[in-house]
Amino acid sequence: MADAATISKLEEGFKKLQGATDCKDVFDQLKQTDKHPNKDFGDVNQFVNVDPDGKFVISTRVRLIDDHFLFKEGDRFLQAANACRYWPSGRGIFHNDKKIISMQMGGDLGQVYRRLVSAVNEIEKRVPFSHHDRLGFLTFCPTNLGTTVRASVHIKLPKXEKLEEVAGKYSLQVRGTRGEHTEAEGGVYDISNKRRMGLTEFQAVKEMQDGILELIKIEKEMQ
């Protein structure tokens, strides 16, 4: 469980977001009694190699907690979490080598996911993660509250004309080749699950898998 001070800061930031006019449509749907689902990695065998022929997916990665080691002033989510107070004074980073990331070349999402689940379960036997019944797993960046899971692929889709349409249908986030705020180079995109909160870890990764399979299907039809 998280300590009281951490919860207090999160609640304070949450109230600021509730009062933001550009967030009204989202927060009107939220209830104080809502709870984030319990951790559930589901049936790991339901995840497959999304690109067995190796024609589209360059690499696959599933990780807990987006890196966010450095950030710029002005992000409304970070401001709401009080991460930009006294800017630019007091900036510092404590960064160790404990990253929980499972990554490999190719599209074998099943193998990547199973390895991550195994690692997380072993780590939790010794070091419990901070968790809140309503907010899920707690991280510094409020956009990652909930499962904190980001499952992504680097995928080549030079002909995909329905990329944004499919991304919206499957709650996918489309980034450029080198991540957020970059362009796609040679038709290569970084595509990941968008939703973190209000669903299980299994559901988050399953959304990504279903969306990627649909994108590959459309790309093949265009060839």
UniProtKB/Swiss-Prot annotation:
InterPro entries recorded: ATP-guanido_PTrfase (IPR000749), ATP-guanido_PTrfase_AS (IPR022415), ATP-guanido_PTrfase_cat (IPR022414), Gln_synth/guanido_kin_cat_dom (IPR014746)
Residues bound to L-arginine: C141, E180
A Pfam family reported for this protein in Swiss-Prot or TrEMBL: ATP-gua_Ptrans
SUPFAM superfamilies: Glutamine synthetase/guanido kinase
E.C. code: 2.7.3.3
Gene Ontology BP terms: phosphocreatine biosynthetic process
Recorded GO MF terms: arginine kinase activity; ATP binding; creatine kinase activity
Keywords on record: Allergen, ATP-binding, Kinase, Nucleotide-binding, Transferase
Keyword Nucleotide-binding (UniProt): yes
Catalytic reaction(s) noted: L-arginine + ATP = N(omega)-phospho-L-arginine + ADP + H(+)
Binding site for ATP: 59-63, 68, 150-154, 175-180
A cellular component term, taken from the record's GO annotations: extracellular space
Enzyme class: transferase
Keyword ATP-binding (UniProt): yes
Domain Phosphagen kinase C-terminal positions: 56-222
Membrane spanning residue stretches: none
Protein family (similarity comment): Belongs to the ATP:guanido phosphotransferase family.
This protein's name: Arginine kinase
